[in-house]
Amino acid sequence: CSTARVMEEIYKILRSGASALTMDTLYHSSLLAHLAPEIAGHLDAHGHDLASSPLGNRLTALDRLTSSGRIWTNGVLLAVLFSDIVPVSAHPPGGKNPPSDDRLLHDAAGILDPISRRMNFSRLNKEQLVRILTSQRKFANPAKKPPQALQAICRKEYFRDALDFFEIACLASGISTDDVAIWREVAVNLPRPGVQRRGVRVRRKGEARPAEPKQAENPAPSGETAPAKKKRRRGPRRRPRTDTAE
């Protein structure tokens, strides 16, 4: 069976609303070791039973939200599977000497490269997965962030996928989803970039000033109005000759 076909089946399982039960069955039948050996190996190494593991909790949360009608991108589904294998997502915000975003992206890509090649992730799905996992630390404690910082994150192209996974992770860990509600409210009320509330265009940094309107030549003195231009008087319209030569 081709790797593309295997990935299609995995995505179907994760979107079925019964992914926790199905993946647990695959794990105990040793089929998961053939479909996704990295995941099965991680469970074996940590002595986890899938149902009670962090992965099992995420799958249960995923099924709960799927049953309510939620739809997921492939990037979110991959994040549910591989979050434990990419530990960069666990770095706490504001910790001692936190790694830079570039370092997180580099580390995550290095871990996922061999996995993505073997399982034949598309380039887009791999990039989505890396962005989702490495951005998770930014979603903690939104109430303590300035509005400008919240809006900047909401404008990122990966924001919605990353927030979807953040919600799944919160439910899986038994954490309140109040922070998720704050983020969604900010996103709904996000002002259009470069526009004030009154609709006045805001000049962005580095943007050239608009050209000043040209002054009319020989303007009228202050307090006076310029004389109106005289309309050219047109004579009577000439009728075409209709007579013929005799």
Residue ranges of predicted features:
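Short secondary-structure junctions and interdomain/linker hinges
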Residues: C1-A4, G17-L21, A33, H46, ...
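Charged/polar, low-hydrophobicity segments characteristic of intrinsically disordered regions
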Residues: C1-G17, L26, A109-L133, V195-G206, ...
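Glycine- and charge-enriched loop/helix tracts that form the active or gating conduit
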Residues: C1-K96, L150
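Structured, non-catalytic alpha/beta "coupling" segments that mediate domain-domain communication
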Residues: I13-L35, C154, D161-A181
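Extended, charged alpha-helical interaction scaffolds
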Residues: H42-D44, S52, G69-I153
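C-terminal accessory subdomains of helicases
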Residues: E157, D161, C170, V202-K205, ...
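Long, highly charged low-complexity segments enriched in Glu/Asp and Lys/Arg with interspersed Ser/Thr
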Residues: A169-P210
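Arginine-glycine-rich low-complexity intrinsically disordered regions
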Residues: V195-P213, G223-A245
